[in-house]
Amino acid sequence: VPELRALIGEVAAEQLERSGSDDPRGVSAALRVCFTRLMKSEKKFFVDQLNMLVKRISQEGKDTSGSNGDLLLRLHSQYPGDIGCFTIYFLNLVRLEPGEAMFLGANEPHAYLHGDCVECMACSDNTVRAGLTPKFIDVLTLCEMLNYTPAPSSSKIFPATQSQLDPSVYLYDPPVPDFAIMRIETPASIKLYLVSAVDSASILLVIQGTAVGTSTAAASEMTLRRGSVLFISANESISLHLSSPDGMLLFRACCLL
């Protein structure tokens, strides 16, 4: 992408090109230099280069998949003149199917571009933005804190495991102790379902279906439908009286202590 190359400069671009897969530290260092030069570009310069790239891709009239042309044009239409449009060339483009999940460690840049997902993250007060946003971008902190270790997108995707105790539960258990996600799918044949107690507090989100919930901690019955969110105390179970003809789909965030 010549417009991106103009922004990061020939020296940095050649350094990245010379970095081999057998030298991960060298690749990381080169990526850091290139990304930092991009993010520190003078606004008029990167806006001019972005407009040139958009014009070139729009006029090519052919397959632009090699340069993520369709994605670039869509993002530019949503965030015109945003430096984040160029960051797609540093990231993997991942399309998740329903039920799939991925785990991103601390300081790994990412962006949700389209669709809906359930996101859970560790407690943090240092969310730093890189672009594709009208909010403040702290460039110096961002470039310093990021993890520049390259990896294929397949290494970030991990499957859910079906519970041996409850076949309706699929567990997404990431390699950190901060949180876990449960996907609960109840078939239409089940009219009474028990959300089992766990040792931590948890949050229950209803994606599909309707039910009336009861628990020893609740003073009255709770009507649950699409979009309902329920806080469940530690060691508390919830009985769901299902009324949906298509069953229910719920997600539960908790800690596995």
Task: State each model region's role.
Residues 1-62, 134-156, 181-183:
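Transition-metal
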Residues 66-118, 123-128:
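Short catalytic-site patches enriched in acidic/histidine residues
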Residues 111-112, 171-176:
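Short, conserved, surface-exposed binding loops centered on an aromatic residue
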Residues 115-171:
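C-terminal, non-catalytic macromolecule-binding modules
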